[in-house]
Curated annotation (Swiss-Prot):
It is found in: Cytoplasm; Nucleus. Keywords: Activator, Cytoplasm, Developmental protein, DNA-binding, Nucleus, Phosphoprotein, SH2 domain, Transcription, Transcription regulation. Residues 477-574 form the SH2 domain. This is Signal transducer and activator of transcription 1.
Length: 713
């Protein structure tokens, strides 16, 4: 049957189950006839003895003739019975082998593939047919449970039939019973594994759990209500505990270890840690944990005092390096004709998870679990080593899917976006590029002069988009992933002046406004405002900054040709609703923060000698440093600019016969030959106390203008 399709195997197993049923009925009938024939032979033997004692030779002779005929008949019945036993043993063997093959395909291929897709879905890989595929898998679990159970019933019934049959000297009944017992044990093991493996986490918890926060998860028993299991589970609970991932790996190798781990290896506390298995209208037998909360997690013990062993220090893991798993287990229960010593102890494990106690740990926790979800095996096989390096192509797929999942953006990362990202993580000027390691991706500084890794930079951008720039990103109003140099060149090449939004690559989680102005000679000069973070945009939204900046008022287009006013109209009603009416409840006139970029038309060539305290340079008395100024990277007429805002808001009988049955059958009895069958992620503050920086204009509605200054290229 190797290479057969699942449907062919199902058909074959169904046919075997039906055949075994008919064979068992035939065997029962033949054994009954054989027992009756033996009883008749015993009666004839007594009759002959009585006739001989009474000296009635003619009657004795007739009785002997009748006995000879009966012996022939009984022998024929016995031969057919022996043949039926051989046939049913062979069929049961075939059925067990097919069931084992199907079970291996179901668990090791189909369910494994589903679980792996479930894992990848947690980093954004599409898995829209998750429920449909799992329902199809459940149908196969139910089919196997039914057929394995039926085969086991026939094996047990035949074994009981053989044990209650006349025990002849040929030992056929005894050997048949032994073989049937072996088959039954094999089928029992298959059933144990099937039920155990049918218990899965159908809805995984979030990859990163935070203490004192609720989490949602669901477990499901895929054999459904087969074998009458729902009634067996009426008084049982599904419980959940959190254990270390190291212990979960031990359990994957030594299943018996789960009892000891379950009892003694608790690393945290979970409220509402048990639920009942319930059957819904779709036939799903599941337990939903919707109100559970991780209330406590044990901290790692510090190294012993005075420990100087470097290995000891290396083995110590930070909170964001420690992985955990949720252990789900059902109260042990008995099933069918299994003995009390063979109760089912069913459990399953979630995928590895991370636990944080503070939002500051989220970036590191997210990257550790992201790498696992993308590249690690779900089997917890100790012989499978963790993936420490991957190609850029595989990493790009992970980043693209994680980006869409995390931000909720409809617009995915484009090929140009990914090309820009690759420049940030692939070491330049190396023709023989090696795979990208986890350390390079998540730990190592993105560039030597920076204090953050590629992941920290990318994660903070995802946070910025999710919280502040989602509409800009989805509508294409934010180019985002483009270098300052390329942005400057692109804007200067357009016939009209324009501005764009790009993510800073020298600061985490920040967006910069780049635009072009014309100098006295009519040449376009690019400027890039100091990057704005989430905190900055909390105080004054990006739309408000764009709308209020005088230098952007005459620029009609966002790069390349997007109508600025159309974009601003989208935010107008939203901003008006946020700000409220012109007067506050106390009768005060509200103030308004306005972003002003001070250009005043004072553009100088790069060759011009700058003054010590020119109007285009930041004052040395300001808290603003040169790092706040952003060069445009165009070789002529370069200028830099930072925007400085005034911060004014806070924002399932028969008895044996005569033992000497062989003498009753006579010399015509032939022992049939029995052939045995052998059998798985700031605004810079201007020093407002300095008189040179106090440039405010008072209007009727009290607008506060804080001026940006330029640093010449």
């Amino acid at each position: 049957m190797m290479g057969s399709s699942s449907q062919e195997l199902q058909t074959a197993l169904t046919d075997i189950s039906k055949t075994c049923h008919h064979m068992w009925e035939d065997s029962k009938d033949l054994q009954g006839r054989f027992v009756n024939d033996l009883a008749e032979l015993q009666r004839l033997q007594c009759t002959i003895t009585n006739f001989e004692r009474a000296q009635h030779p003619e009657q004795a002779f007739q009785a002997k003739q009748a006995m000879t005929e009966m012996q022939k008949k009984a022998t024929g019945v016995y031969e057919m019975l022996a043949q039926r036993r051989n046939e049913i043993i062979s069929k049961l063997n075939d059925g067990a082998n097919i069931a084992s093959m199907m079970q291996g395909q179901l668990i090791n291929d189909k369910l494994f593939t589903w679980k792996n897709a479930q894992k990848l879905a947690q980093i954004g890989m599409p898995f829209d047919d998750r429920e449909q595929l799992l329902d199809e898998i459940q149908l196969e679990f139910e089919f196997l449970a039914d057929n394995i159970w039926q085969l086991n019933m026939f094996a047990c019934w035949m074994c009981d039939l053989c044990r209650r049959a006349p025990q002849l000297n040929d030992g056929l009944a005894q050997s048949s019973a032994a073989k049937l017992t072996t088959i039954s044990e094999q089928l029992n093991r298959l059933l144990f594994v099937l039920v155990s493996q049918s218990f899965i986490v159908s809805v995984q918890p979030e990859p990163v759990l935070k203490t004192q926060h609720k989490f949602v998860t669901e477990v499901r028993l895929l054999i459904g209500d087969k074998l009458g299991i729902r009634q067996q589970l009426m008084n049982t609970n599904v419980s959940v505990k959190i254990i270390a991932e190291d212990e979960a790996r031990v359990m994957s190798v030594d299943c018996d270890a789960q009892k000891e781990i379950r009892a003694n290896k608790q690393v945290g506390s979970i409220s509402n840690d048990f639920e009942k298995l319930t059957m819904d209208e779709r036939g799903h037998l599941s337990a939903k944990f919707n109100n559970s909360k991780l209330t406590r997690i044990a901290h790692r013990k510090p190294p012993p005092k005075g420990a100087s062993d470097m290995k000891c220090a290396a083995n110590m893991q930070a909170a964001t390096d420690q992985k955990y798993a949720l252990l789900f287990f059902i109260t042990p229960f008995q099933m069918g004709n299994l003995s009390k010593e063979e109760q089912l102890d069913v459990w399953t494990l979630s995928l590895p998870i991370m636990v944080t106690v503070h939002g500051s740990q989220d970036c590191d926790a997210q990257v550790a679990i992201l790498w696992h979800r993308a590249f690690a095996s779900i089997s917890r096989d100790p012989n499978v080593h963790d993936v420490t390096a991957v190609s850029w192509e595989n990493l790009a797929i992970m980043l693209r899917n994680k980006f869409s999942l995390f931000t909720g953006a409809r617009r995915p990362l484009s090929e140009s976006d990914l090309a820009y990202l690759s420049e940030k993580i692939i070491i330049p000027n190396m023709p023989d590029q090696k795979p990208i390691t986890f350390t390079r991706f998540a730990k190592q500084a993105m560039r030597e002069e920076l204090a953050f890794s590629f992941w920290e930079w990318f994660f903070s951008i995802m946070q910025l988009i999710k919280q502040k720039l989602l509409k800009y990103w989805d509508e294409g109003w934010c180019i985002g992933f483009i270098s300052k140099h390329d942005a400057s060149q692109s804007m200067c090449m357009l016939p009209n002046t324009s501005f764009l939004l790009r993510f800073s690559d020298t600061q985490t989680g920040a967006v910069s406004i780049g635009f072009v102005c014309q100098d006295d000679d009519g040449q376009k000069v690019p400027f890039h405002l100091s990057p704005l973070t989430i905190k900055d945009l909390d105080q004054l939204s990006l739309a408000s900054r764009i709308a209020s900046c005088p230098q952007l008022k005459d620029i009609r287009y966002m790069y390349p040709n997007i109508d600025k006013e159309e974009m601003l109209r989208y935010f107008e009603s939203e901003e008006r609703h946020r700000v409220g009416g012109p007067e506050s409840p106390g009768g005060y006139i509200q103030s308004e923060i306005v972003m002003v970029a001070k250009t005043n038309g004072n553009f100088r060539r790069a060759s011009a000698a700058p003054s010590m305290f020119g109007a285009d340079s930041p004052s040395p008395l300001s808290i603003q440093s040169k790092l706040d100024w952003s060069p445009g990277e165009i070789h002529q007429s370069m200028m830099e600019m930072t925007d400085e805002l005034g911060h004014v808001l806070n924002v399932g009988g028969m008895d044996s016969m005569h033992p000497d049955a062989n003498t009753l059958l006579g010399p015509a009895f032939k022992n049939p030959t029995f052939h045995p069958h052998d059998q798985q992620q700031h605004l810079q503050f201007v020093d407002m106390s300095h008189p040179q920086m106090m440039q405010q204009q008072h209007h009727g509605h009290n607008h506060n203008h804080t001026h940006n200054q330029f640093y010449p290229s």
